[in-house]
Amino acid sequence: MERIETRGLVLYNRNFREDDKLVKIFTEKAGKRMFFVKHASKSKLVASIQPLTYADFIVKINDDGLSYIEDFHQVQPFKNINGDIFKLSYATYILALADAALQDKVYDPALFAFLVKTLDLMESGLDYEVLTNIFEIQLLGRFGISLNFHECAFCHRVGLPFDYSYKYSGVLCPQHYQQDERRAYLDPNVPYLLDQFQAISFDELETISIKPEMKRKLRFFIDQLYEEYVGIHLKSKKFIDDLSSWGQIMKPRTENEETE
């Protein structure tokens, strides 16, 4: 087994036998790996194997079975996310989405950095719903999906009030709406924002300001895209959907919602 030191993000853990755990960690240097932790509740590793824990790990990598954690340091627990059920539910969802998008043992430092940066921005207080939307749109490529929100699929003009066509996996300008009678009939701001989401770099993102009604439209359409093109159904996503109903009782009203 190869011994390495790597940054890692705990995706989840689950019980194994009486007091052991299997811990799924997305590592920067070795991709996603499953680690075996014996007597987990009494182990010195217990603080490092909780979901949404980001740390430096010293590990032994086994390409033919379970890997092992030797030690850890510099733990970042994402306290703000863990202290808010709404942020936590969305963070848990993007962890599950990243897990679904990448096979185990595949080296993907770009996705690792993107996932960690998304969580950092959530932790800093940026809009977790919109950050999740951006993550979902940019992650489509990992599922082998390429969608065009930038230019008309026929005339290639840009900057127009586009609508989306599932038939052409891209947008249509008003002149070519008739090419697909079953187009999505979207608010033109939805494909406009998704085009921005595809291109944006989180290193440049400082503020997010999107009204609640537009966020609902984005959520609805991105759900349709994932159903049509990806077809995965994650438990963490269902929990988010449930939050949109009963969770509103607990959620503090934002300034935008109060002025609507």
Swiss-Prot record:
GO terms for biological process: DNA recombination; double-strand break repair. InterPro entries: ARFGAP/RecO (IPR037278), DNA_rep/recomb_RecO_N (IPR022572), NA-bd_OB-fold (IPR012340), RecO (IPR003717), RecO_C (IPR042242). Keywords: DNA damage, DNA recombination, DNA repair. It holds the Pfam family RecO_N. It comes from the Bacteria. PANTHER family: DNA REPAIR PROTEIN RECO. HAMAP family: RecO. Belongs to the RecO family. Involved in DNA repair and RecF pathway recombination. This is DNA repair protein RecO.
